[in-house]
A protein has these predicted regions:
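N-proximal helix/coil linker or "cap" segments that precede and/or mark the start of modular domains
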Residues: 21-40, 108
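Structural microenvironment flanking redox-active thiols in thiol-disulfide oxidoreductases
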Residues: 75-113, 126-132
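Short pre-active-site segment immediately N-terminal to redox-active cysteine/selenocysteine motifs
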Residues: 56-58, 62-66, 98
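Conserved redox-active cysteine motifs that mediate thiol-disulfide chemistry
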Residues: 62-79
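A short beta-strand-turn-helix
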Residues: 37-58
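Thiol-/selenol-based redox modules, centered on thioredoxin-like
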Residues: 142-174
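Bacterial Sec-dependent N-terminal signal peptides
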Residues: 1-28, 174
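Short, internal strand/loop/helix patches
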Residues: 109-142, 150
Length: 174
């Protein structure tokens, strides 16, 4: 007589593995230029990055190359990415640059600034719909950042100094 409990456990594990694989959405487009690979998503494709349920700390920063405060704070995000990437830590820099600027401006920017954190582009013109899905309190201004781990989640519509960013990250680690 087969061990049904073992079969059920095995099927459940396989189910969750498949769900995890398929929850990572496919990009709308993948750009490759000058050794940089950049994925572009609509909001439905980006949303899984905003709602992972595992023991990893996620830092998601919304920025653009034309946003002076965004560009000013990016080195702080890069420094924190380098400092914490050995732990269960994932940083994603979500560019809100226009699609026509990806190859001419975003990719050269990534290369010139030597950005090591994962950069993706959000290409979804229906901002009035997706902004409130990111955070109810978000006006749409950038820079904006979400930091979350499991059920703890905070949204910031502000620029960060290095010290402020590290303090917030540490509040999720400790």
């Amino acid at each position: 007589m087969p061990n049904y409990k073992s079969c059920i456990v095995l099927l459940t594990v396989h189910f969750f593995i498949l769900v995890n694989v398929y929850s990572q959405s496919k990009p709308l487009k993948v750009y490759e230029k000058d050794g940089i690979t950049l994925k572009s998503y609509n909001f439905d494709g980006l949303q899984p990055f905003l709602n992972q349920k595992n023991d990893t700390l996620y830092v998601i920063n919304f920025w653009a190359t034309w946003c002076v405060p965004c560009v000013k704070e990016l080195p702080h995000f890069e420094k924190m990415n380098k400092k914490y990437n050995k732990e269960k830590f994932k940083m994603i820099l979500v560019s809100l640059d226009f699609p026509k600027m990806i190859e001419s401006r975003v990719i050269p920017f990534i290369k010139n600034k030597n950005l090591q954190a994962e950069v993706v582009v959000l290409n979804d013109p229906d901002a009035n719909t997706w902004i409130e899905k990111v955070a109810n309190e978000w006006s749409g201004a950038i820079p904006a950042t979400i930091i979350y781990k499991n059920e703890k989640r905070k949204f910031y519509e502000q620029s960060f100094t290095e010290e402020e960013l590290e303090t917030e990250i540490k509040s999720f680690i400790n």
